[in-house]
């Protein structure tokens, strides 16, 4: 597999056993993918695990979706930056002041600052879920509303469904990064993600980075699956 200038695939790690996780990671080349550490693994293994991945030269997306008062979120984002992560996220529904505080605290890091990304509408949520929260907008409308707020707050991009990507690129510009979960290679089970696309469809729609978990982590030959995905994006 040739070295990729900007790997598009972010592998979502979902292991409860640290040694299993490290064995899986040992098969990967950081030139060909990035890694996502979410709440479950971070709670299991802590920041030292993230440091291990960074030391192996992987770009790490720390997916903890911070949502709290501005000062608390800013402090947490600073700690993430000190871990050396490539990307960190916050909930856009925390509001503009929270997002602005998180962005401001990263200023001293300059070009070494992680990408600061907002979560809009979780891909498992549909219209009925939003209505139960008192939101009468469609998922797509709510995504646009929160994505615009994130850009106004100075953030680098948003997590969004591939189905919103094309419109968001047009609305918010090419430099505003779109990170897309709910990606399944052809023939994969949809799992718990309601709004899904294949990797090529998502990139063609405007997504910049693709979060893919079980189709790679649970594959018999994960390196081959990753290679096939990367090849499909060339």
Curated annotation (Swiss-Prot):
Known EC number: 4.1.1.23
GO MF entry, a single one: orotidine-5'-phosphate decarboxylase activity
Listed Gene3D superfamilies: Aldolase class I
Entry annotation: catalytic residues: 65
Cellular component GO terms, alphabetical: cytosol
Disulfide bonds: none
SUPFAM superfamilies reported in the protein's UniProt record: Ribulose-phoshate binding barrel
Pathway: Pyrimidine metabolism; UMP biosynthesis via de novo pathway; UMP from orotate: step 2/2
Source organism, top-level taxon: Bacteria
Binding site residues for substrate: 14, 36, 63-72, 123, 184, 193, 213-214
Record key words, sorted: Decarboxylase, Lyase, Pyrimidine biosynthesis
Presence of the UniProt keyword Lyase in the record: yes
Pfam family, one: OMPdecase
InterPro entries from the UniProt entry: Aldolase_TIM, OMPdecase, OMPdecase_AS, OMPdecase_bac, OMPdeCOase_dom, RibuloseP-bd_barrel
Biological process per Gene Ontology, one example term: 'de novo' pyrimidine nucleobase biosynthetic process
Catalytic activity: orotidine 5'-phosphate + H(+) = UMP + CO2
Family per similarity comment: Belongs to the OMP decarboxylase family. Type 1 subfamily.
Function (record text): Catalyzes the decarboxylation of orotidine 5'-monophosphate (OMP) to uridine 5'-monophosphate (UMP).
Subunit structure: Homodimer.
Protein name, as recorded: Orotidine 5'-phosphate decarboxylase
Gene that encodes it: pyrF
